[in-house]
C-alpha cells in the first residue's frame, strides 16, 4: 500500500489492454486484396475443411482471414473487407471477411441470420 506522498510523486498507472485485432490499427474494418485462398483443418476435436484467405490489407499488413458461410466466390486479387473476430478452432486466424461487401458475394439461399452474411430479404 503506497503512502499518499508516494502517490503524489508517482500516481497510479492504468492497465493497458492489448488489442485483439492489431492489424486493423484501431479501425472497425479494413480493405484488402486476397493473395491466397485455401482450406485448412481445425484443431483436435473438430474435423472439417475451413475456408480461409491470406489478405494483404491497405495498411500494408498481411493477415489470415476466415471466409464465413457456405460457398464463396473469392479468388486471388479479390478485393475484400476484413473485420475482427477470431475463429476458435483455427490457430492464427483472428479476422473474418465481411460477406456482401466489395468483391465478396453474399451467401445464397440464406433465411436466418441474413445480415451476418450479406443476404437480402427473399421476395415472396
From Swiss-Prot:
GO molecular function: rRNA binding; structural constituent of ribosome; tRNA binding
InterPro entries to which the protein is assigned, alphabetical: NA-bd_OB-fold, Ribosomal_uS12, Ribosomal_uS12_bac
Keywords: Ribonucleoprotein, Ribosomal protein, RNA-binding, rRNA-binding, tRNA-binding
Keyword tRNA-binding: yes
Keyword Ribonucleoprotein: yes
Listed GO biological process terms: translation
Region annotated Disordered, chain positions: 1-30
A cellular component term, taken from the record's GO annotations: small ribosomal subunit
UniProt-listed PROSITE patterns: RIBOSOMAL_S12 (PS00055)
TM ranges: none
Basic residues: bias regions: 9-18
Family: Belongs to the universal ribosomal protein uS12 family.
Function: With S4 and S5 plays an important role in translational accuracy. Interacts with and stabilizes bases of the 16S rRNA that are involved in tRNA selection in the A site and with the mRNA backbone. Located at the interface of the 30S and 50S subunits, it traverses the body of the 30S subunit contacting proteins on the other side and probably holding the rRNA structure together. The combined cluster of proteins S8, S12 and S17 appears to hold together the shoulder and platform of the 30S subunit.
Subunit structure: Part of the 30S ribosomal subunit. Contacts proteins S8 and S17. May interact with IF1 in the 30S initiation complex.
Name recorded for this polypeptide: Small ribosomal subunit protein uS12
Gene source species: Leifsonia xyli subsp. xyli (strain CTCB07)
Gene behind the chain: rpsL
Amino acid at each position: 500500500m503506497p503512502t499518499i506522498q508516494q502517490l503524489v510523486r508517482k500516481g497510479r498507472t492504468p492497465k493497458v489492454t492489448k488489442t485483439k485485432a492489431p492489424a486493423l490499427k484501431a479501425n472497425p474494418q479494413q480493405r484488402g486484396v486476397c493473395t491466397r485462398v485455401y482450406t485448412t483443418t481445425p484443431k483436435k476435436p473438430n474435423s472439417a475443411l475451413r475456408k480461409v484467405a491470406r489478405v494483404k490489407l491497405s495498411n500494408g499488413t498481411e493477415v489470415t482471414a476466415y471466409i464465413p458461410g457456405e460457398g464463396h466466390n473469392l479468388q486471388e486479387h479479390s478485393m475484400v473487407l476484413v473485420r475482427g473476430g477470431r475463429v476458435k478452432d483455427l490457430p492464427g486466424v483472428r479476422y473474418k471477411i465481411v460477406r456482401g461487401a466489395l468483391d465478396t458475394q453474399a451467401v445464397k439461399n440464406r433465411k436466418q441470420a441474413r445480415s451476418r452474411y450479406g443476404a437480402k430479404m427473399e421476395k415472396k
